[in-house]
Regions:
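N-terminal intrinsically disordered, cationic/polar leader segments
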Residues: 1-31, 35, 39, 43-107, ...
């Protein structure tokens, strides 16, 4: 992995074997970034996404191995109530069905993804404040808490 800050953005190049969310967290820790949004593209060889099931307050896990094009990655990094960084990302991946050669898609809440060739991520750093996190009793999930200066 390599990264460089240019303006308010950090450009991250991920290499074969890098885990996307771990790398984003490491960059944020190294650069003392409290909150940011990110987007990216690339190729992966192992992806785990999940679908939230509201009635169970739990996720249904989906895992795929093999050549997966990361056609869209979007997410954010926030600071939780204990001061820890938390990533929240959704991704969309395409892959070939082996028998037909047709393209299939896998998308959802990203739990992990391992780079197979390269990943190109743009991290937009929140300036003049930060995004925290708080529990919302109505929905039963953690939501953004918009803060002033960090």
């Amino acid at each position: 992995m390599d990264y460089k800050k240019m303006g308010s953005r950090v450009y991250i190049r991920m290499d074969k074997g890098d885990e996307i969310l771990s790398c984003i967290r490491r960059v944020c820790c190294d650069m003392d970034i409290k909150s940011a949004t990110f987007q990216g593209i690339g190729a992966c060889d192992k992806v785990v996404v999940a679908t939230f099931i509201p009635e169970k307050q739990d996720f249904l896990r989906h895992e795929r191995n093999g050549m997966l094009e990361m056609i869209s990655l979007q997410g954010n990094v926030v600071t939780d109530v204990n001061g820890r960084l938390k990533e929240h990302a959704h991704g969309m991946f395409s892959y070939l069905l082996p028998d037909s050669g047709e393209i299939a898609y896998l998308g959802g809440h990203l739990q992990s993804a391992r780079i197979s060739y390269t990943g190109e991520i743009v991290l937009d750093v929140v300036e003049d404040g930060f995004i925290g996190q708080q529990f919302d009793a109505v929905t039963g999930i953690d939501v953004w808490k918009l803060e002033g200066k960090a």
